[in-house]
A protein has these predicted regions:
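Rossmann-like dinucleotide-binding domain for NAD(H)/NADP(H)
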Residues: 1-95
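A conserved regulatory-domain signal marking ACT and ACT-like small-molecule sensing domains
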Residues: 67-244
Length: 244
């Protein structure tokens, strides 16, 4: 009926398959069923599928998913940056007070020797997570951006000053403001996601839990007042940083 643009098949009801009406279609590719031909291979294939399903249900990136724009193998050096880019997107939207019409994802460091385009998907997922009612995934994030006319670009450079790898989200808002959020991913014993910059302020803050950002007049007593108000409201402060 012409409803399917193309298909690839390697599993058939009866194998080996030597005759099928599907062979007549130019837009259908058929191959012998070579994978998972042993019990051990079938077990590993089942585990791989189960892991992918778990990732999808958790809203995380699924490698090799056919309906993900940046699908495929993600380098081990890039994987830790996926949750970082997503968190930066969430912080960006919170600080901006909404989604910016255009955002650039800047990636710096030797990691750009690998394909880092998947980080734009992670950033979009974070940008829209708190502004739409539906669940935001790596699949629908680009669609949400397109529907709202939001453009998300990618910029890469090998040079970075203070960190081996740095990811920055930069965007201009409709009111003329520019919002910039930067972060890095620490590996090894101190493995964590860190916020390193917000607009013109340098930070060194773990990107976990509930984050509060305040802009106030630089004068004595303000930090104490903020701490007192939060304490009276029953809010426990795990860490605090002041930047100028």
């Amino acid at each position: 009926e012409g409803r399917v643009a193309g298909a690839g098949l390697d599993v058939f009801a009866k194998e080996p398959c030597t005759a099928s009406p599907l062979f007549a279609f130019d837009n259908v590719v058929v191959t012998p069923h070579l994978g998972a031909s042993t019990h051990e291979a079938q077990d590993k294939a089942g585990l791989a599928v189960a892991r992918s399903v778990k990732l999808a249900l958790q809203g995380e990136f699924v490698p090799d998913a056919v309906n993900v724009q940046a699908g495929g193998v993600v380098a081990e050096e890039v994987r830790p940056l996926l949750p970082l880019a997503e968190k930066l997107g969430r912080v960006f939207t919170a600080v901006a007070g909404g989604v910016a019409p255009s955002v650039t994802v800047e990636v710096r460091g030797e990691v750009v020797a690998h394909d880092v385009s998947v980080l734009t998907l992670a950033a979009m997922k974070g940008l829209f997570t708190t502004v739409v009612a539906e669940q935001v995934t790596y699949v629908n994030a680009p669609l949400l951006a397109a529907d709202r006319g939001v453009q998300v670009g990618l910029s890469t450079a090998t040079e970075t000053l203070d960190h081996p790898v740095l990811v920055t989200l930069r965007g201009a808002l409709l009111d003329g403001r520019t919002v910039t959020v930067s972060g890095t991913a620490l590996t090894g014993p101190r493995e964590s996601l860190r916020l390193t910059g917000l607009d013109d302020f340098d930070l060194e803050l773990e990107a976990e839990g509930v984050l509060l950002f305040f802009r106030y007049v630089d004068r004595p007593g303000v930090v104490g007042t903020v701490g007192t108000l939060l304490g009276e409201a029953g809010v426990n402060i795990a860490a605090m940083q002041v930047a100028r």
